[in-house]
A protein has these predicted regions:
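Conserved RNase H-like, two-metal-ion catalytic cores of nucleic-acid enzymes
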Residues: 1-80
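Glycine-rich loops and low-complexity Gly/Arg-rich segments
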Residues: 39-42, 57-59, 110-115, 193, ...
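Conserved DEDDh/DEDDy metal-dependent 3′-5′ exonuclease domain
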Residues: 54-132
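Internal catalytic-core helix/loop-beta-alpha segment
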Residues: 97-100, 121-159
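Acidic, Mg2+-coordinating catalytic module of metal-dependent nucleases/exonucleases
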Residues: 140-201
Length: 219
């Protein structure tokens, strides 16, 4: 029996940056975790301030040292916040890796089995299939998914253990990606209160070609 044509597996890229603001109980951490299935191709593209909706994310991007000059409009994105810990994931822009400020991870193709949040996903996946929306499930379980965000990641960051903090964030970003992908496929996840259309990937590509790296009318 002949097998069908093989699909070339593309390594996802994850770029992570963190920015702190305030001290003690008022400490906030902005974490930018951007995922793409492709390496950046067009070095002429730049970060557009109007494409970065969340002001704290804008600070994390624009206050990087040295200043960010190159960024690349790519696939998909959303912003979530939980207990002062802000996670930005797949925002449609992949940042150029900068020494000390950014770490780039090249990972094998993602699967649920590779996620450290696999047990979390398994526990809520049956509920997600049984309900018309997964948005509430994501919100209800965000604290469990990002449980390290307020404790371990913050503690590591304050101790100067930047690599450990970024690695923990990367693991959570992968798990959250999977949960949000489930919502995107159902067309139920919302960004800034507006539903992301089922054909969000086509709309985004069209928006990028038109010079707008935002979500193409879905905001």
């Amino acid at each position: 029996m002949e097998s069908g044509p093989r699909t070339r597996m593309v390594l996802p890229w994850i770029v992570v940056s963190m920015l702190t603001e305030g001290e003690g109980e008022d400490l906030r951490i902005a974490a930018v975790a951007l995922v793409s299935s492709e390496a950046p191709k067009d070095p002429r593209a730049f970060v557009r301030e109007d494409a970065i909706a969340h002001p704290f994310m804008r600070q994390a991007v624009l206050k990087a040292t040295p200043p960010l000059k190159d960024a690349y409009p790519l696939l998909g994105g959303w912003v979530l916040e939980h207990r002062g810990f802000v996670l930005f994931d797949r925002f449609g822009t992949q940042l150029k890796a900068l020494e000390k400020e950014f770490l780039r991870y090249e990972l094998p193709p993602l699967s649920f089995a590779q996620s450290p949040t696999l047990e979390v996903y398994r526990s809520i996946a049956p509920k997600a299939r049984a309900r018309p929306t997964v948005e509430r499930l994501i919100q209800e379980n965000l604290g469990m998914i990002l449980s390290r965000g307020r404790d371990s990641i913050t503690a590591m960051w304050l101790k100067g253990e930047v690599t450990g903090a970024l690695e923990a964030l990367r693991q959570d970003a992968i798990g959250l990606c999977m949960l949000l992908d489930l919502g995107l496929k159902r067309g139920t996840v919302k960004l800034d209160g507006a539903p992301i259309p089922v054909d969000w990937d086509r709309r985004l590509r069209s928006a990028v070609r038109a010079g707008n790296p935002g979500l193409g009318g879905s905001r």
